[in-house]
Amino acid sequence: MICGKTACGKTTIVKGIANKYNEVKSYTTRPKRKGETDEYVFVTKEEFDKLASENKFINIRYYYTEYGLWRYGTPLEVLLNTENPMLILDEQGLENIQNKLGRDNIISILIEADETVRLYRSLNRDEATEQNTREIKRRIKDDDIKFKKRELYNYILDNNNLDELQKNIKFILNLDLN
């Protein structure tokens, strides 16, 4: 499980190691960002609520944003039936899944990045409207509250150098999978 604050590089990292690990994509009701392709399974509110009512998610998270309520769900069946699953989560999602599947069954990695870098990345990946800027700043501020339980993680790594970080993650995962 890869966790980290907004724009710390989680998706980039997962794409860089996807040849050995299989990404489990969360479902979401949020709109696609400009240039975003397949990072999530995008569904309507109605589709999400139907899947949730059928207990198809092991983890559900709700985020109140400048744009309204966004829903995220981790598909249970896909997670359980995927060999070497790789999943991007927030801290509460990690804790939920650890409680359900057992902490010893999960390798958890927290990715950290400087707040200035995260703000720069966020502003450059989204259209720079006043509403987007408010939402980005809200998320970055909110992350300071949502990422405090360092004891949940097996590893905590800095994303100062992407190539070095990917090497470290591959090394960690190979050690834990062998």
Where are these regions (language model features)?
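Hydrophobic anchor at the beta1->P-loop junction of P-loop NTPases
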Residues: I2
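P-loop (Walker A) phosphate-binding loop of NTP-binding proteins
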Residues: K5
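Conserved lysine of the Walker
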Residues: K10
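Post-Walker A alpha-helix
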Residues: I13-V14
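Post-Walker A helix-loop "phosphate-sensing" segment adjacent to the P-loop in P-loop NTPases
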Residues: N19-S26, K45
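ATP-dependent small-molecule kinase phosphotransfer cores
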Residues: T28-P85, D90-G93
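Conserved phosphate-donor/acceptor-positioning beta-strand/loop module used by diverse small-molecule
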Residues: N84-E91, L101-N124, D158
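Small-molecule kinase domains that catalyze NTP-dependent phosphoryl transfer to phosphate-bearing small molecules
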Residues: E127-I172
